[in-house]
Amino acid sequence: MRIQDSSTIDIVAAAIIVYNDQGFVKSGYGHYEYDDDGNIVREVKDNKSMISEMIVSGRTFTDEELKAANELSDSINGKMMLKKLTGQLNNFEANVVKALSEAPNNFAVSIIASLPHSIAVDKKREAVNDRMAQLKHSSQFFGEKGNRYDINVEIVDVKYIQTSSVYMITGVYAGKDIV
């Protein structure tokens, strides 16, 4: 079967299956895993390639897999519709809307391949934001300017800031102070 002959829901179902199996591997970042002797143990392909192979092979999906795909698609469409109405769609989100609403093609597969990971990242980000919103009311400044402290903190979030090539690490000290 060709990608063009499949349905968008089949591609979403394949994306969920691949993500659940191997997490998210960006296009072009496939690799080999080796054992201690240097022998190839397995090839890890990027998600887009795995999804394309699954669709082209004619894989059929269970009712449960299709239900999960429909739920993910409906959830994303709902969020994107609200953003579209308020004029707040970024370029990626506009491509998501296009990929989910038009006939499947290779570009749509590449966009849909990232959706399960994007949803997982959004859920994590929401949880971190909720926690930070709660903590900002109890968080207090401690220490003196110019001094160093050796403290134990709980790491809550690590973000890579691409424009600065640095990591922003957010932690919590004593369960109440944001560091």
Model-predicted segments: where are they?
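Beta-strand/loop nucleic-acid-binding surfaces
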Residues: S165-V179
